[in-house]
Amino acid sequence: KAKRQTDEPTTQLATSEVVNAETPEEELEAAHGRIEASLAAEVLARVKAASPAFFERLVVDLLLKMGYGGSRADAGQAIGKGGDEGIDGVISEDRLGLDIVYLQAKRWEGSVGRPEIQKFVGALHGKRARKGVFITTGSFTSEATAYVEHIDPKVVLIDGRRVAELMVDFEVGVTTIRTFHVKRVDSDYFEEA
């Protein structure tokens, strides 16, 4: 009977392992996701600790990496011009400058509420703008998020968590330390075998 008791947990463990088994590719993807989430959290902490001037440069770098704006000099002139009726800057939506996106960048710790967004939208109306992006290191209240869903002009809200994710995705402030190449059999090569 003692032997049977020791066999049962082993059998249960083996069965449990089979049920929860992931393919090596799935394990690699899950680990990659955990690494990127941890990296994004570290990036956000560093962004929040940085100066407002650094945050403005970061916004320029990120938008350029995302394909907005023309040159670094053009984008740099567009950001950080405070005191312009609630608009921190403008940047071209594309390299040709066919459309303009108005920006508000706030390095805040707390939540940005609907009143702040309404001020920004009012400033956009004053410029007859069709598009705006409000970027913060903090978060947005549910009222702010709900408000922008049904208004014209189109306003995109980017909170601190999303800023960090975009920085990781577009390689702003991060560097690649290792690359893994996952390979499979090339069926075409063996087609005539």
Regions found by a protein language model. Give the residues of each.
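Mixed-charge (Asp/Glu-Lys/Arg
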Residues: 1-193
